[in-house]
Regions:
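Charged, alpha-helix-forming regions
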Residues: 1-256
């Protein structure tokens, strides 16, 4: 019976089904104890999330400060510094989805955060910064590692030489307000991308800035370290104990 199975969701849109939905109701003192335990997990997760938000703001502050130069950097256009490749249609062999297989190993990226699919071939053979150039996500900047194919007018931007660190390019473009000039559907062409200006200090300074910002970025976003890992672990812990406690409330025995 779905209504009585552990973890079943309350039905939606059907008033009669909602009214008949069954769930365990232990004694009030047991309810209070379960609420106390689960609320403590929720509070901890909320505190960690607030701390992560503060760290992200701190990262953005230092990124903006580090990328603001008074006189130690030249101002150049993306067209002077980089090659810009515009994505086209998906490869004919593209398998849509977020999981590759033994033959389709190269990601196909569209204008969003998520991978569009995988292909046996690739168009870009080095690390690049990509810029969404059509739709609501226009102007969003992402870093993509080598061997991928951009599609749906996604712009792949790559330094022409080793005087520009690709990660520095990513951080610099992340602080730049990239806007579409279109009055209808937001979109950007390659010439608009090439006209964007960024500061370019010496490669030694670029590398130092990249080291600082990459470490900060990892602390804020990497699910394997720092606060993101802690939040994910606490969320899993909360879900585990929630199921354990509600199973006890329903049956009198735990999952152990």
């Amino acid at each position: 019976d779905v209504q009585n199975s552990r973890g079943a969701k309350m039905p939606r849109g059907d008033k009669e089904a909602v009214m008949k939905y069954k769930f365990p109701v232990p004694p009030l003192d047991v309810q209070r104890e379960i609420v106390h335990i689960l609320d403590s997990f929720t509070l901890l997760t909320a505190e960690l999330t607030a701390e992560l938000t503060a760290r992200k703001k701190q990262y953005e502050f230092y990124r903006n400060r580090l990328l603001h130069f008074e006189s130690d950097a030249q101002i150049k256009t993306i067209g002077d510094l980089c090659t810009v490749v515009t994505g086209g249609e998906p490869p004919t062999d593209c398998i849509k989805g977020e999981i590759s297989d033994s033959t389709h190993q190269y990601p196909v990226w569209g204008n969003g955060k998520e991978v569009y699919g995988y292909s046996e071939t690739y168009k870009i053979d080095r690390d690049a910064v990509v810029i969404s150039s059509i739709g609501a996500n226009t102007g969003a900047v992402y870093y993509r590692e080598a061997f991928f194919t951009p599609i749906i007018r996604l712009k792949a931007v790559m330094p022409k030489d080793d005087k520009l660190n690709t990660r520095f390019l990513f951080h610099a473009l992340s602080t730049t307000e990239i806007k579409s000039k279109s009055s209808s559907v937001p979109n950007m062409n390659a010439n608009e991308i090439k006209a964007i200006k960024i500061p370019v200090p010496s490669i030694a300074i670029q590398n130092k800035i990249v080291s600082i910002l990459d470490n900060f970025d990892a602390i804020c976003t990497d699910l394997n370290i720092g606060l993101p890992a802690e939040i994910e672990a606490r969320q899993k812990q909360y879900e585990y104990y929630r199921d354990l406690l509600l199973t006890f409330a329903e049956t009198g025995s735990t999952l152990l």
